[in-house]
């Protein structure tokens, strides 16, 4: 089994990475492979609604999004992490998630997901509210802990001083490992995820 962790921070080894590493550490301890994918510092343009991804060949703009889609095909679960920028996910992470969802949502469906964010001080809850919208759109079981998944600090050393936040990250890793094993056991017993029909599309204004 493998979990793909997305680092939406422009700092490759910063606070968000520290939080994701705590999650990955617990997954690794349970015998689950992990990979942290950095969205990076190059600008990630937003989705323009062109519909080109409907052909099933990824996003027409390519880049880190299509690289993530390829990795998503073989991943069993995901963790989406971001720093807090003006009480929301980073700009690159927002564009990345929008395009990943539109062009690669079929590879996210029914796979467990966790979210987390890192901030110096505030804006965490609104950021988590933003991130949770993506797994809720694709039938993804949401992995939680004993508190909202956030850490605080201006640098990795300070994040590690946030004992409660770090403990919650570790809970996410352990709980995700448990859920993945449950899903694996279910498959071995012949239990598959439901095949839901395509939902009807209705507009608020006819």
Feature map (PLM): residue ranges:
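N-terminal beta1-alpha1 ligand-phosphate binding loop
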Residues: 2-30
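Generic secondary-structure signature for well-ordered alpha-helical cores
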Residues: 25-32, 77, 101-105, 136-140, ...
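A short beta-strand-loop structural module common to alpha/beta enzyme folds
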Residues: 32-42
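Cysteine-cluster motifs in flexible loop/terminal segments that predominantly coordinate metals
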Residues: 42-72, 200-206
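Helix-loop-strand module that forms the ligand-binding subsite of alpha/beta enzymes
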Residues: 55, 60-147
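Glycine-rich phosphate/pyrophosphate-binding loop and the adjoining helix
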Residues: 141-206
């Amino acid at each position: 089994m493998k979990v793909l962790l997305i680092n939406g921070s422009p700092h490759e080894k910063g606070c968000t990475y520290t939080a994701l590493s705590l999650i990955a550490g617990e997954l690794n301890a349970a015998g689950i492979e992990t990979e942290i994918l950095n969205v990076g510092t190059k600008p990630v343009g937003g989705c323009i609604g062109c519909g080109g991804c409907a052909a099933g060949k990824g996003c027409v703009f390519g880049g880190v999004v299509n690289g993530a889609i390829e990795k998503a095909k073989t991943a069993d679960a995901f963790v989406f992490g971001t720093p807090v920028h003006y009480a929301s996910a980073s700009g690159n992470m927002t564009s990345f998630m929008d395009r990943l969802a539109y062009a690669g949502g079929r590879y996210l469906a029914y796979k467990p997901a966790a979210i987390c964010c890192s901030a110096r001080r505030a804006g965490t809850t609104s950021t988590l509210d933003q991130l949770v919208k993506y797994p809720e759109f694709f039938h993804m079981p949401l992995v939680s802990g004993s508190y909202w998944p956030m850490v605080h600090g201006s640098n990795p050393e300070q994040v590690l001083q946030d004992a409660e936040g770090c403990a919650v990250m570790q809970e996410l890793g352990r709980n995700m490992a448990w859920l993945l094993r449950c899903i694996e056991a279910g498959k071995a017993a012949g239990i598959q995820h439901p095949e839901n029909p395509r939902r009807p599309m209705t507009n608020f204004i006819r």
